[in-house]
Amino acid sequence: MLVLGIESSCDETGLALYDTEAGLLAHALHSQIAMHREYGGVVPELASRDHIRRVLPLLQQVLDDAGRTRADIDAIAYTQGPGLAGALLVGASVANALGFALGVPMIGVHHLEGHLLSPLLTSAPPPFPFVALLVSGGHTQLMEVKGIGDYKLLGETLDDAAGEAFDKTAKLLGLGYPGGPEVSRLAEFGNPGAFELPRPMLHSGNLDFSFAGLKTAVLTQTRKLSNACEQDRANLARAFVDAIVDVLAAKSFAALKQTGDKRLVVAGGVGANRQLRERLNEMGKRRKVEVFYPDLAFCTDNGAMIAFAGAMRLKAAPELARHGYDYGVTPRWDLADIRLPEARTS
């Protein structure tokens, strides 16, 4: 089965072709970072318009790269949510129009399920079950994953996501957009221990997160350093990254202890952070835990993860396929709501 995947939930337009027998055949991505940089963040209206411009050329690109035609497509998966409503509607409209024209089934995919399953696209995918740390600009969650569509929420952020805290800290330090990579790069030059920042909820006794207080602590320090030199900024960036990594790592391994699992999957844009990967790998070796990541190309939003997640869902539950023309989207969508029928009764 050849599945076309379409991702348009925020500021990346991603398309991919995934074959259930041959694997990933082609993927293409257009990022809107340059367009949004002058505004310091994503402008929803501009994002939607750019998706409209990019989606059909990218479709033709992946078909050409894979040596296939539209007639070869057996099913279409698209990001149904969560995300920006206008951006989601672009991908959903194209998916449904193309599916209607070709007479093939369609399936709406949860954006976070795409991230959750993206490490399975690697050459050495993790077997089930595992604990997943989903960490991005909009979400920070710990999930226990027993199989496709069988996910249990263990903990989540009560306020800001880790990626949002990175972006806000970047602005406070006068760095560019997107903030996460800029903060991480600056932190490379910082001295550990130069600033003391809190580790929110590190000893809370549960698996939830909170990063709003850490962001406020960074704001307080920047006000004290109104005439900060570059080294001061680097030191503060280092303190911030160390605090984030401490909390994410500690909670992840607490989740593994709680579930008894021995495999940790890290997904989402913040999962590409070098400092976080180094800490998790180090702790994994000490505690005999395998740690898995998606390829760096698939840490950010992409069509490959949507094509793959859609293919796995259609394989596990063919009755989920939709026919006809129905391009509803779900800008706010709880991952717990997408459990497969057999997972609900198990």
UniProtKB/Swiss-Prot annotation:
Free-text remark on how the cofactor is bound: Binds 1 Fe(2+) ion per subunit.
Domain of life: Bacteria
Pfam family, one: TsaD
InterPro entries documented for this protein: ATPase_NBD, Gcp-like_dom, KAE1/TsaD, TsaD
Keyword Iron: yes
Main enzyme class: transferase
The UniProt record lists the keyword Disulfide bond: no
GO cellular component: a single term: cytoplasm
Binding site for Fe cation: 111, 115, 301
Function: Required for the formation of a threonylcarbamoyl group on adenosine at position 37 (t(6)A37) in tRNAs that read codons beginning with adenine. Is involved in the transfer of the threonylcarbamoyl moiety of threonylcarbamoyl-AMP (TC-AMP) to the N6 group of A37, together with TsaE and TsaB. TsaD likely plays a direct catalytic role in this reaction.
Matches recorded under PANTHER family: TRNA N6-ADENOSINE THREONYLCARBAMOYLTRANSFERASE, TRNA N6-ADENOSINE THREONYLCARBAMOYLTRANSFERASE, MITOCHONDRIAL
Name of the protein this chain belongs to: tRNA N6-adenosine threonylcarbamoyltransferase
Provenance organism: Cupriavidus metallidurans (strain ATCC 43123 / DSM 2839 / NBRC 102507 / CH34) (Ralstonia metallidurans)
Gene expressing this chain: tsaD
